[in-house]
């Protein structure tokens, strides 16, 4: 097992970064604030299932860039596609062949999308679906589930209040109270709370945003019947169902969580995996709804870099890798092996955990309670997770620096990687 106690170059880079970059990082999630502080690890390169930092340490990577790198780092097929595209020009500002090819490929994989439009990020995709839903329905209120993250647009940075349903309050400075009043939050997996909320507000609701499988307070599956009930109740009140599949699309099957549960939304927002590692977003839905978007309709959305050739090329290449036989079966088998090893280690070292896994993604919560909603995830011991995170790093395993994030497997992880990871878990649990 590789250990990585020497990180002097990372420490020095962090001190330099603090002078030039806000907080030393370009996204708060990269900070180690949630795991006890200190300098984050600065990576030099990624290769397959591994990261190599600026001090030469190797890590088995389960961050996978918070999910997008399902094919591992620097996958040869995706790299080749990027090189070919870049040799012809990275940005056109005009229509081109690759955006048509990629749109067709996404539609084939996710049949609920009659029409598709590309954006630059998942945040943009979600933000635009809400705008389109409001334009289509003529209504203003938006519903989301407590603890579910839908990007950093003002409307989505709303925290859950107390009680079964509440008008939101701002979760970030700079988000106005007026904006917060446009969002209603409801506990995930609670059909009755959703039903009661819609009885009160349904005639004003434009849409509900749903992570069909939660990925932002760990991996949490919907309870049986929950997604169908949300669809039925929403449509009874004339509102639209939007699936935020930025994390879930192509993570658990070739396609989306819609195929896993057999339920179709009105619109779908995509990101992360579909770019093969490059910035991307997309949204799609029923033709009559999507025709609300300019230039056909009054809902405006645009982007200089939307549909750029590089992202289209890597996106197509990524899906070509994922559609090969056996990909998701391998991810599931490795996930099962990792889960069994973590559970055995927890029992051996008398460490209390709850583990949620779906195929190639899992979350370890330091709590004895079953986690089916955000309230349950909050009970995970953050201080203990912080110590576990740093111990795993010392033992050559890279995780997300937050108790709420998932471990993501890639097509490049091997059984040997899983065995090394289980060894690291045992060493770390022994020191908690």
Curated annotation (Swiss-Prot):
Reaction catalyzed: (S)-4-amino-5-oxopentanoate = 5-aminolevulinate
BP GO annotations: protoporphyrinogen IX biosynthetic process
GO cellular component, one term: cytoplasm
N6-(pyridoxal phosphate)lysine, modified sites: 272
E.C. no: 5.4.3.8
Principal cellular location given in the protein's record: cytoplasm
Pathway per the UniProt entry: Porphyrin-containing compound metabolism; protoporphyrin-IX biosynthesis; 5-aminolevulinate from L-glutamyl-tRNA(Glu): step 2/2
Pfam families documented for this protein: Aminotran_3
Protein family per UniProt: Belongs to the class-III pyridoxal-phosphate-dependent aminotransferase family. HemL subfamily.
Protein name: Glutamate-1-semialdehyde 2,1-aminomutase 1
